[in-house]
Amino acid sequence: MAEITIYQKPTCSTCRQAMQLLKESGKPFTAINYYEKPFTKAQLKNLLKKAGLSPKDILRTKEDIYKDLGLAKKNLSDDEWLDTLVAHPDLIQRPIVEKGEKVILARPAESVKELL
């Protein structure tokens, strides 16, 4: 059985809720704070591919950095969006949960149950 990995930010309430659900399940999992261990471009691209999502699908458009960089007005390629997300992790929706070949954006947190 594949182990579950949750990519999260400890101060995020949705991440904390998803982590609590994982703990309650009793299933083994690994929690990765992607601020301490940042995504590589290849890693994020692979996670998005497994999830069937594009970089824009996980973009946090209400973050100050989104506005500061003028991203709403930019027409970037997926590759350029990946570079932007890796450079500015605050722009990444969270948590991202991986189990083998399946990846989900666990919003709401209860959606993590799909992987249990």
Predicted regions and their residues:
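Local sequence-structure signature of Cys/Sec-based thiol-disulfide redox active-site neighborhoods
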Residues: 1-21, 25, 29-34
